[in-house]
Amino acid sequence: AEQLSGKTPLFAGSTGGLLTKANVEEKYAITWTSPKAQVFELPTGGAATMNQGENLLYLARKEQGIALGGQLRKFKITDYKIYRIFPNGETTFIHPADGVFPEKVNEGREKVRFVPRRIGQNPSPAQLKFSGKYTYDA
């Protein structure tokens, strides 16, 4: 299992808390490096002050980690990583899965739902209606 390092951000108040699910099923950790100490919004509500250098924050859901990543991008912090941690201590790296964020171009990444035509070249749904083909297959 990979050992995660970093200090927990400083917050005055509730972090929304980890659910008991975190001890039974899984929890998530997000790590990032900050050039300076600055206040940011927590996805669970409230605000916290991130430390200069490495930061580590545990969250109950993956979506909270993705949301926090969006917050960090406003601070020009793009080196964040999200991990899934199982109750037995096993850690898996989950985002960005292949090391490149989904919105960036990556050589060799398969195109999903790609249709090689302009929108004006789409077939008319009226012509396809009883042909047995779907508009997304034509």
Curated annotation (Swiss-Prot):
Q: Which residue positions does the secretion signal occupy? A: none
Recorded hits in InterPro entries, A to Z, give: PsaD, PsaD_sf
Instruction: Please give the biological process terms from Gene Ontology that the record holds.
Output: photosynthesis
Concerning Pfam families, the annotation shows: PsaD (PF02531)
Q: Which SUPFAM superfamilies match?
A: Photosystem I subunit PsaD
Keyword Chloroplast among record annotations = no
What Gene Ontology cellular-component terms does the record carry?
photosystem I reaction center
Q: What does this protein do?
A: PsaD can form complexes with ferredoxin and ferredoxin-oxidoreductase in photosystem I (PS I) reaction center.
The name of this protein is: Photosystem I reaction center subunit II
Q: What species does this protein belong to?
A: Nostoc sp. (strain PCC 8009)
Gene symbol of the encoding locus: psaD
